[in-house]
């Protein structure tokens, strides 16, 4: 009896290492953490840099007024200051970050009601905000740029050594990046933390998606598992920005990042318990070369759709909060909540179409999704307040959910159909496409907005999505590799063969004793 009790934890660990569902949980949590950290900085960084740097710029002016003026500013009669972001008044002693007093050397009239102040007061510091578009865009894009550089090495690496080690390396780097965000007080340190996040995200995303594709070999089950895993991505996008804005407003800058660091520790402990290094067979190291996959036109079409659809929301991350600050006089907490409809709709879209796309046709879902992305982006500049952003942002999130949940399984399907069923490289390509969108979007958006304005930027990226959408028709019936050769030699008709998995019974790649029979579930 005593031996049975002592052996129970070992038995549970052994069963857990052979469970596909726990692997799905690990990938879900990893994507959740990555995307919470991705979006939690969206409302924090613009306000934090404004509070620190713009305040420092104006502090030199504070020393300019005469002694009598300074005394008058501290007197009870003139102890109120106007916030040009949320049209509220407060005492100078109750100054919090992101509130800037009128310090031009003259005494402003007492403000008693927000409605009595002209609306153009919310445009104070507009030159600084326009300059911040570029710097914040580069900061946000640095994560995707670094991820873009690392992905081509991570994909083949997972084919060689398996998925456990890259997943755990990704966890450690993400944990370090989260701590750096918590305690960084300058733009340079924030930039380093963001680039570190890109490295960790590359390891976690490529290894996680490749792991799911290896474990779930059935096309229907794979689509469902990918939809659930992308739900973790969606949930991270859902709670990241609102969570960051609320915690920054009422607790402080470090608090959301410390909570995410604790979540990273939980994910690392879960990985350490249930994931073990793969027993890599010689055939698993003979996957299709990355360059060969990049020459496949069908993989390129799918990757282009992923890139352009996600570029739409990537452009909004640095530009929408600043546009709201300039045109809507929005307070800090609204800057994060503006992304809430998109995140909720993305969560619904990924889970709904992870199952429906297999019945409707994944190519059709991706085509409709890209058109919807374009239309939603065209409607964003029409909003005059945060309530006007609900519809366009919700449509954008739902449409991107359609595209991602449809095209991620297609990437694995194309490798099974046209190449060798080793998935590290193809999901590295998918992640590269995602990263290109999140690299080009914020960086170019931050540069273009001061030149042509935010509305025209939305028109351009929305139109590009609509124009690209018809290319998804090529994904309807992609030919198998043997069919392609036969078609070129005119030796067989062009009908598409029925899709069959090359290795229908694939051993669980992460089990400690993969030779032992047992249930996968």
From Swiss-Prot:
**Does DNA repair show up as a keyword for this record?**
no
Q: In which tissues is it expressed?
A: Detected in adrenal medulla, and brain (at protein level). In brain, specifically found in the medulla oblongata, pons, prefrontal cortex, striatum, dentate gyrus and hippocampus (at protein level).
Its GO biological process annotations read: serotonin uptake
Q: What is this protein called?
A: Chromaffin granule amine transporter
> What influences the activity of this protein, per its activity regulation comment?
Inhibited by reserpine, and the proton ionophore carbonyl cyanide-p-trifluoromethoxyphenylhydrazone (FCCP).
Task: Provide this UniProt record's keywords sorted from A to Z.
Answer: Cytoplasmic vesicle, Glycoprotein, Membrane, Neurotransmitter transport, Synapse, Transmembrane, Transmembrane helix, Transport
Task: Report membrane topology.
Answer: Multi-pass membrane protein
Q: Which GO terms describe its cellular component?
A: synapse; synaptic vesicle membrane
UniProt gene name: Slc18a1
Organism name: Mus musculus (Mouse)
Span-the-membrane segments of this chain are 22-42, 136-155, 165-185, 195-215, 225-247, 254-276, 297-316, 333-357, 363-383, 395-415, 420-440, 446-467
